Amino acid sequence: MASFHANSARKAFNSLQSAVTFYAHNVSAHAAMSLVADAVDIVVFVDREVTATGTVRYVSEILEVHELAENGQPASTPIFGPDPAREEFDPRGYPLHQPEGNALWARRAGLDLNWLHPSRGEWAQPFPERQLA
């Protein structure tokens, strides 16, 4: 497990690729992205927003990472993300669907995948009122 800073879950791939090529000068950009796709199981994106009561941090997206795709980026599946029906007033993530494949990463981490079932996808508290600009 590691912490890495990026502006979105998908932008984490390019940031990780840049780090690999910066520190391993003999690795091509394509090889670096392939290493990222092989090494990363999931990306958890924690976002933040200023609300009327202060800054709130929340999980907005979880991507399950797969092999390198033809476009040169790791293929990924959003398993947790914003609900379009609620996004206007609640940007937090909600379960979208179960992970693909055997989800070995989840078992290794002790994650009960039942928590990613849409019927269990409710936060304990409503999202705080947004601060007016």
Q: How would you label these PLM feature ranges?
A:
Residues 1-42, 50-58:
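Conserved P-loop NTPase nucleotide-binding/switch module
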